[in-house]
From Swiss-Prot:
Name this polypeptide is given: UPF0145 protein GK1405
A Pfam family annotated for this UniProt entry: YbjQ_1
InterPro entries: UPF0145_dom_sf, UPF0145_YbjQ-like
Family to which this protein belongs: Belongs to the UPF0145 family.
Length: 105
């Protein structure tokens, strides 16, 4: 499955647009991890804990989006966009959206 942020795929022709697909993931962060991450942020370092959480959320959201595209008969997802939102109580939401398409063979 080709997944791209562009609206076209060089050298490929889109046979059919199958619709918008999305993958949503909500992840929680615990108090101890938040505390340690805040210490890292205060002393000026990067927060590896949150960076890994962001990467995990991104991968899970893309995987869910791809699964939905496959169920529509797609072999590619174009125009992919990723959004991250902070929710209350230490929750984080990652959303991957794109357009499921079938490319000509």
């Amino acid at each position: 499955m080709i997944v791209t942020t562009t609206n076209t795929i060089e050298g490929k022709e889109i046979e059919e647009y199958l619709g918008i697909v999305a993958g949503e993931v909500i992840l929680g962060a615990n108090v101890v991890r938040d505390f340690l991450a805040s210490i890292t942020d205060i002393i000026g370092g990067r927060s590896g804990t949150y960076e890994s959480k962001l990467a995990e959320g991104r991968e899970m959201a893309i995987k869910e989006m791809v699964n939905k595209a496959r169920s529509l008969g797609a072999n590619a997802v174009i125009g992919v966009d990723l959004d991250f939102e902070t929710l209350r109580d230490g929750m984080m939401m990652c959303i991957a959206t794109g357009t499921a398409v079938r490319l000509k063979s």
